Amino acid sequence: MKRFFPFVAFWFSMTVLSAQSAIERVIEIRHAYAEAQTMMLHAIEEPNMDNSMHIEMRRMFGGTGMQHYTIDYFSGDFSEEEPMEGVFVWSPYFSRVKYNCAARVTVTEYLIEPRTGALMFVYTKSDDHPLDFSEIGEGVYELRKYYYSDGTYCTGSLKVTLPDGSEKSLDEELNAKIHPFDADADENNYVRYLISIHNHMMNNE
């Protein structure tokens, strides 16, 4: 567990930064994402570690058939005991949600500041067009959204790989469509929901 300490210091430093440019924030988040990937590899390689969780859910809908969700969580030594006896709060630093429905697959990754639960970064890869980009048509969409340390929207990028293999950047169109306040509310509310599921499961083992 000692290897977590440098990582904790790294994350903590992320929360005390003053105002910064979008470029600086993007660079910072990319470093944090790389750190998270390293931590996840450690968690996966060590079967006795108790800081990861895998949840699967299936439900049938008449119109679209079977919907299949998988949610993975990775958290370090960040648990805090609540005033209620025996109730603990864990703050995952990373969550991955995979959604499969009607032969379409969407995978979304959430990078989370574990001390505060604030959203840092969202990456979505999907066979379906996000944010109503239906005019582009079929393709594989990769959406990235970056957030400041207080959880407010910073910037984003969107790339689509078309069936012929060509790529198209939709960065300007994406940032024109996204209203920062809506982005803040939608994504941060969903991350809080994911964390609540995680903590419910951890406290009901």
Regions found by a protein language model. Give the residues of each.
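Sec-dependent N-terminal signal peptides
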Residues: 4-15
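Buried hydrophobic residues that stabilize the cores of well-folded domains
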Residues: 21-205
